[in-house]
């Protein structure tokens, strides 16, 4: 299987140098995950967005392996004949022995080839395979856990496929198998147990036990080393799942996580230190003109404003031109996603805006799917009233315009008293009467099944944000995924994000965090935390994140009340910005999108694959492990111009250097004079796209001189190429 090219690791700035080039000829990559062409959670986004970059590297030697689902194949996959004789013989052999294996092309950007295994069609072998799993790995799976049983079937089918592929290949290829999450982990364990010549990688995107523990309101990060992991997993009836995850982590040639914070978590809960961190990226669409994404923001904001006009009919006593739209979105995990902190901060922000007589109004959206039975009647009525008013205004406008045209046509000025007749005034009075409302605008757009016990609604009742006229902060809970076909808010998620001013994601447990990353690539400022993978990554790479519209909330070193106060300060300072300052900040935020592009972050996966090849096939690939020296990293400096608002240019971490000088505040007029958008854009893009990555003198070098803004902190024991140590990466030491 010729690939006809080689790839030099030394060509990638910031990664450790390699003495020899890796020849990828006769090397095949299989990426195995339950979410291949099967949307369940965030791993689907990782695979979908990464496919093009990986395909560009591996060509036709890259395959994704996932479960067969009728819905997924019907809408996302084009079934094809296998392109190589070895692959065709493999599928024919498995299908002839009672399996159902499909081959096709995933209809996403990059069009990767996929192998889909029908788990249900192989259920006849479940009990036998569960017995073999017990004999091989001492992992027992209860009959009632359907998800775990599916993982067993999927794992055995994956191992069968890989073994059959190797047997059917005339020229034995070097196979790399990359497994994502515990649902695919059984296959990795079996590959090692059967001694298949396969280089294995296991990536955990979030530990099972970590998610369960954080949902239970424990002081998770301060007690990582104190948890009895077997006892905790057993009490939550996930011990068998935990064993699958832990076994996969220990069996893999290379173990990776998506962030430094998750690496520390995995080290304590899974008892293995990750070999490398592989951050998640996105496919970034660059605009030909700087103002293009600003125009998209204005267009999307207009769509949101139409919804707000209808939702707040009868109480629309605030200026929409002085209204800011904040939002939080994601899985409905009230504490893990930080919805509790956001609501408390909104209550404090409402108080500050009221006592200071601010003209700004904030509308905060909560986009979190929950159990509902229908739309709220008042919400539907609001949109109907808005449409009726629009139709009435258009009717009167047409009649007025026609009479004006006829009057001007004959060369005379119109008599304004005759432009509208009695019928027109009656129509307008009826429209005004329709806007009368006795109750406050609803907080929730749907009827909740558990209204009395819903965490968001219960908290709103406690803090008293009922969308009254006196409130400067309005709250809208939309417990459903956004859709352009919705009768309430007819926009998709991407358009909604573009129309908002600030995304707020004060998560307590967030191994990576795609929502703030999506905000960044769309030029929308966001709030993240130093307990999220995204927040830690940005703190490591940006000297002053808030100046670029990335506000890092400290939830690691502060109490819950202090974190709420810090978030309130962020939100209030954001409300004080002028429109021009927000435009400048959005420009800066959008410039960071290069940092989150798979073209940049894909190098971490590349490094993990090369490490696995070197460990599995040492006679063909060489790898010299060494600690990254102090110069292996770079922090983007503050923007060239003054910060976007007088109070925001500061580090959010309490551990920043005290000798760093804060920029001098300037009056608005001086700010405008100093700011040159084109000049600053050029400087920022030079910082982001072409940082001066230092090169090590040799593979064993462990020291380096300071250059520019290179972070010279001691490096982490987890190998993370091109990344300096962050506060989050030293949690183990901080706990002591």
UniProtKB/Swiss-Prot annotation:
The modification Phosphoserine is found at residues 8, 11, 412, 641, 645, 649, 652-653, 657, 698, 709, 726, 730. UDP-alpha-D-glucose binds at residues 205, 211, 331, 510, 512-513. It comes from the Eukaryota. Allosteric activation by glucose-6-phosphate. Phosphorylation reduces the activity towards UDP-glucose. When in the non-phosphorylated state, glycogen synthase does not require glucose-6-phosphate as an allosteric activator; when phosphorylated it does. It holds the Pfam family Glycogen_syn. GO terms for molecular function: alpha-1,4-glucan glucosyltransferase (UDP-glucose donor) activity. Alpha-D-glucose 6-phosphate binds at residues 291-292, 294, 297, 301, 501, 582, 586. Keywords: Allosteric enzyme, Glycogen biosynthesis, Glycosyltransferase, Phosphoprotein, Transferase. The modification Phosphothreonine is found at residues 700, 720. One of its GO terms (cellular component) is cytoplasm. It is an enzyme of class 2 (transferase). Belongs to the glycosyltransferase 3 family. This is Glycogen [starch] synthase, muscle. It comes from Bos taurus.
């Amino acid at each position: 299987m010729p690939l006809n090219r080689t790839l030099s690791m030394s060509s990638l700035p910031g990664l450790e140098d390699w003495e020899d080039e890796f020849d990828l000829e006769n090397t095949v990559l299989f990426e195995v995950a339950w979410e291949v062409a099967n949307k369940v959670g965030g791993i689907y986004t990782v695979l979908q967005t990464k496919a093009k970059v990986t395909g560009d590297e591996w060509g036709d030697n890259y395959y994704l392996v996932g479960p067969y689902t009728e819905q997924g194949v019907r809408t996302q996959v084009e079934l094809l004949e296998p392109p190589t004789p070895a692959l065709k013989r493999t599928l024919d052999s498995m299908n002839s022995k009672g399996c159902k294996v499909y081959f096709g092309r995933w209809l996403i950007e990059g069009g990767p080839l996929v192998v889909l295994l029908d788990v249900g069609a192989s259920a006849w072998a479940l009990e036998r395979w569960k017995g073999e799993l017990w004999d091989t790995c001492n992992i027992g799976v209860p009959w009632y856990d359907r998800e775990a049983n599916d993982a067993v079937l999927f794992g055995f089918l994956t191992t069968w496929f890989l073994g059959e592929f190797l047997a059917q290949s005339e020229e034995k290829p070097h196979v790399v198998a990359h497994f994502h999450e515990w649902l695919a982990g059984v296959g990795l364990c079996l590959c090692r147990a059967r001694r298949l010549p396969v280089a294995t990688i296991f990536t955990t995107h979030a530990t099972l036990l970590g998610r369960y523990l954080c949902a239970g309101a424990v002081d998770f990060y301060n007690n990582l080393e104190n948890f009895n992991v077997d006892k905790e997993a057993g009490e939550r009836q996930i011990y068998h799942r935990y064993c699958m995850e832990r076994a996969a982590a220990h069996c893999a040639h290379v173990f990776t996580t998506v962030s430094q914070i998750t690496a520390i978590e995995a080290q304590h809960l899974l008892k293995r230190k990750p070999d490398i961190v592989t951050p998640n990226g996105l496919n970034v669409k660059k605009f030909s003109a700087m103002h293009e994404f600003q125009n998209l923001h204005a267009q999307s904001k207009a769509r949101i404003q139409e919804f707000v006009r209808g939702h707040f009919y009868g109480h629309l006593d605030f200026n929409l031109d002085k209204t800011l739209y904040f939002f939080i979105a994601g899985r409905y995990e009230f504490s893990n996603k930080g919805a509790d902190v956001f609501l408390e901060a909104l209550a404090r922000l409402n108080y500050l805006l009221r006592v200071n007589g601010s003209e700004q109004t904030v509308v905060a959206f909560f986009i979190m799917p929950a159990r509902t039975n229908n739309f709220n009647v008042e919400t539907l009525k609001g949109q109907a009233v808005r449409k009726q008013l629009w139709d009435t205004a258009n009717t009167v406008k047409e009649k007025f315009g026609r009479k004006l045209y006829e009057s001007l046509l004959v060369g005379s000025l119109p008599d304004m008293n005759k432009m509208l007749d009695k019928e027109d005034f009656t129509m307008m009075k009826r429209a005004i009467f329709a806007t009368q409302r006795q109750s406050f605008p609803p907080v929730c757009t749907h009827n909740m099944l558990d209204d009395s016990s819903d965490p968001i609604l219960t908290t709103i009742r406690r803090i008293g944000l009922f969308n009254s006229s006196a409130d400067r902060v309005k709250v809208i809970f939309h417990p459903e995924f956004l859709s352009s076909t919705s009768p309430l808010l007819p926009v998709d998620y991407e358009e909604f994000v573009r129309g908002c001013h600030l995304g707020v994601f004060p998560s307590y447990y967030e191994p990576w965090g795609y929502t703030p990353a999506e905000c960044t690539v769309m030029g929308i400022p966001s709030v993240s935390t130093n307990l999220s993978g995204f927040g830690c990554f940005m703190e490591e790479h940006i000297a002053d994140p808030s100046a670029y519209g990335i506000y890092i909330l400290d939830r690691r070193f502060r109490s819950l009340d202090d974190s709420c106060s810090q978030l309130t300060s962020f939100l209030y300072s954001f409300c004080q910005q002028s429109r021009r300052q927000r435009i400048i900040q959005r420009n800066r935020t959008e410039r960071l999108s290069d940092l989150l592009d798979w073209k940049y972050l894909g190098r971490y996966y590349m490094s993990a694959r090369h490490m696995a090849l070197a460990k599995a096939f040492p006679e063909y690939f060489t790898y010299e492990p060494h600690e990254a020296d102090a110069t292996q990293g770079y922090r983007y400096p503050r923007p060239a111009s003054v910060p976007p608002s007088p109070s925001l240019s500061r580090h959010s971490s309490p551990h920043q250097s005290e000798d760093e000088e804060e920029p001098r505040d300037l009056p608005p007029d001086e700010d405008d004079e100093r700011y040159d958008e084109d000049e600053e854009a050029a400087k920022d893009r030079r910082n982001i796209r072409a940082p001066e990555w230092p090169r090590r003198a040799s593979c064993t070098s462990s020291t380096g001189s300071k250059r520019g803004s290179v972070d010279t902190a001691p490096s982490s024991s987890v190998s993370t190429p091109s990344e300096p140590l962050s506060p989050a990466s030293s949690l183990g030491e901080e706990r002591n």
